[in-house]
From Swiss-Prot:
Keywords: Cell outer membrane, Lipoprotein, Membrane, Palmitate, Plasmid, Signal
Lipid modification (S-diacylglycerol cysteine), residues: C20
Name this polypeptide is given: Lysis protein for colicins E2 and E3
Lipoprotein keyword on record: yes
Localization: Cell outer membrane
InterPro entries per the UniProt record, alphabetical: Lysis_col (IPR003059)
GO (cellular component) term, any one: cell outer membrane
Bilayer disposition of the protein: Lipid-anchor
Protein's gene: hic
Length: 47
């Protein structure tokens, strides 16, 4: 039972991380109209 919980937590972490990375990449490419929280945290200048 403990192993299943660990696998589920790992999957959730991967999904969350990949979602954050997708937002970060979109910010770098200037895909957003307004700077998102990730751009503000990393200090990226949005055009």
């Amino acid at each position: 039972m403990k192993k299943i919980t660990g696998i589920i937590l790992l999957l959730l972490a991967v999904i969350i991380l990949s979602a954050c990375q997708a937002n970060y990449i979109r910010d770098v490419q200037g895909g957003t109209v307004s700077p998102s929280s990730t751009a503000e945290v990393t200090g990226l200048a949005t055009q």
